[in-house]
């Protein structure tokens, strides 16, 4: 509807975060820089390939098209939006309205002249075949999944694995309905070790605890919450304390076996934590391979959003990079 054409805030508190200077908006990358980042018409029209249909790629494709370029957006899966719907499910029932992001970007793509090609994996041969003037790579970087003993056990879950498992249910039921259904059944064990206490790990710990799971959250350093805006981040650990979530700092998982997860502390010592399942929630890490491949056949190439890894994988930077 008409509301989807408006960049509605999601109550994420990014624009209020004193840590982020200059201030930025998660869904409005032009906040405070409206003149500098206005989509001005280009002097020379180009044919542009945008690789990756997540928030950064969708924002980039729309902006380039608005400026007058001929844009084709490529996504290797069957749907645009990246992991937005999965994030909306995890945050369902809270204060954030994550689906505003998906609805707005989808509406903008539909209104634009951007050509969308789903289920299309971009390789060097395709780029040479299409012969674009420029390529923008906005595809996800790989998540860090350390090769420890037991990492391939069937009761170990990674972010890419959970994203894939959730694709069909999310399409069938939507984030809110699926979140409600998960309160009655979620296909993991009762006792869970979550490895990684950044934004993904902390929010996963809250989601799972609300579904009656016993949680041990393993932080590789002293920080819990990562790049979650300060307004919400400062509330996380008090909630964990009240809810009975155990936080283990300065530790890593050395092995995962039948008895549970073997933690190894940075100051020395080990602890075996009995558990039924382990979730690996470590952050993305930059892998230049895709960009290097995409850049080789063309004169102009850029990498944005999740391709850069680290902070750029998160929506605020993804939108800004896409702009």
Regions found by a protein language model. Give the residues of each.
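Short FAD-binding loop at a beta-strand-to-alpha-helix junction that anchors the flavin cofactor
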Residues: 297-323
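A Rossmann-like FAD-binding core segment of flavoenzymes
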Residues: 98-145, 153, 158-161, 169-190, ...
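Beta1-alpha1 glycine-rich phosphate/pyrophosphate-binding loop at the start
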Residues: 50-119, 191, 197-231, 246, ...
């Amino acid at each position: 509807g008409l509301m989807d054409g408006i960049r509605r805030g999601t109550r994420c508190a990014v624009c209020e975060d004193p840590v982020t200077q200059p201030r930025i908006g998660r869904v409005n990358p032009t906040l405070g820089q409206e003149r500098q980042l206005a989509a001005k018409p280009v002097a020379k029209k180009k044919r542009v390939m945008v690789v990756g249909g997540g928030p950064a790629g969708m924002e980039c494709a729309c902006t380039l098209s608005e400026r007058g370029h001929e844009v084709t957006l490529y996504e290797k899966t069957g749907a645009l939006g990246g992991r937005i719907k999965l994030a909306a499910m995890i945050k369902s029932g809270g204060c954030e309205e994550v689906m505003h992001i998906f609805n707005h970007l989808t509406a903008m793509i539909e209104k634009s002249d951007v050509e969308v090609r789903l289920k299309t994996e971009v390789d060097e041969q395709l780029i040479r075949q299409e012969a674009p003037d420029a390529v923008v790579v906005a595809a996800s970087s790989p998540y860090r999944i350390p090769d420890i003993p037991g990492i391939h056990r069937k009761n170990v879950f990674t972010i890419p694995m959970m994203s894939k498992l959730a694709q069909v249910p999310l399409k069938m039921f939507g984030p809110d309905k699926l979140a409600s259904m998960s309160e009655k059944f979620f296909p993991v064990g009762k006792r869970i070790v979550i490895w990684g206490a950044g934004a993904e790990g902390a929010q996963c710990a809250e989601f799972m605890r609300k579904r009656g799971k016993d949680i041990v959250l393993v932080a590789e350093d002293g920080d819990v919450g990562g790049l979650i805006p300060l307004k919400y981040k400062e509330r996380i650990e008090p909630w964990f304390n009240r809810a009975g979530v155990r936080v283990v700092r300065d530790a890593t998982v050395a092995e995962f076996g039948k008895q549970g997860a073997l933690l190894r502390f940075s100051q020395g010592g080990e602890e075996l934590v009995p558990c039924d399942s382990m979730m690996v929630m470590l952050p993305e890490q930059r892998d230049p391979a895709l960009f290097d491949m995409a850049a080789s056949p063309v004169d102009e190439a850029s990498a944005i959003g999740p391709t850069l890894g680290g902070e750029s994988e998160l929506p605020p930077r993804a939108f800004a990079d896409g702009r």
